[in-house]
């Protein structure tokens, strides 16, 4: 047994050292730039027509709008934690999910430059569509799960092209992403 892998701390260090520097840069760049860009939305309650109708016990339209997996996720999270609109909590979860997505994209494109990786993470998380998503903060974490699923599906297909089971899992991830919010299919393509 590897001495570094014998403790949880050693395992974390081993995994951390295997992550390319550009991927880490994209991840942390997305977090920092995401917080700088969206902190006003996270620290203030900005209501809109949809949120007034769906708070405190909703997550948006479900299967009737083709968002069958949003209904499943919303029901699961609603049963466990309740459906609340907490901008800071929802925003931090969303930024984390989008930062992971930015890191996966940096890995897919095999980026070497830390500066370009930070720029990728920054552009990815400060894109106007993300700002628009954060105006519907009560459902933003679900939509960011859809982004992560779509990017993860593409990453798995590129990283493991000859693994049939992972390719099938990628298709399932794409289907679930489409079942949350159809607009994020372009992330996979």
Residue positions per predicted region:
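Short, Lys/Arg-rich, polar N-terminal cytosolic tail immediately upstream
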Residues: 1-19
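Transmembrane signal-anchor helices characteristic of membrane glycosylation enzymes that use polyprenol
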Residues: 18-48
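Juxtamembrane "helix-exit" motif on the non-cytosolic side of transmembrane helices
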Residues: 40-48, 77, 126-136
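Short hydrophobic/aromatic helix or loop-helix immediately within or flanking a transmembrane segment
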Residues: 61-92, 96
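Membrane-interface micro-motifs in multi-pass membrane enzymes
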Residues: 63-67, 90-94, 115-158, 179-184, ...
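Transmembrane-helix motifs of polytopic, lipid-linked glycan transferases
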Residues: 92-114
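Short hydrophobic alpha-helices at membrane interfaces in multi-pass membrane enzymes
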Residues: 156-176
């Amino acid at each position: 047994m590897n001495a570094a892998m014998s403790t949880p701390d050693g395992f974390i260090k081993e995994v951390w050292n295997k992550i390319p520097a550009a991927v880490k840069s994209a991840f942390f760049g997305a977090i920092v730039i995401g917080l700088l860009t969206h902190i006003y939305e996270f620290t203030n309650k900005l209501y809109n027509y949809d949120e007034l109708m769906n708070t405190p016990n909703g997550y948006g339209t479900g299967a009737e709008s083709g968002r069958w997996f949003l209904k499943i996720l919303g029901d699961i999270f609603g049963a466990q934690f309740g459906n609340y609109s907490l901008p800071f909590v929802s925003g931090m979860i969303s930024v984390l999910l989008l930062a992971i997505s930015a890191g996966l994209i940096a890995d897919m494109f095999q980026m070497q430059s830390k500066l370009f990786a930070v720029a990728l993470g920054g552009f990815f998380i400060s894109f106007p569509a993300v700002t628009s998503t954060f105006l519907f903060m009560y459902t933003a974490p679900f939509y960011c799960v859809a982004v992560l699923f779509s990017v993860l599906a593409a990453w798995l297909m590129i990283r493991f092209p000859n693994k049939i089971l992972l390719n099938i899992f990628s298709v399932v991830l794409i289907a679930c992403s489409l079942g949350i919010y159809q607009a994020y299919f372009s992330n996979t393509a």
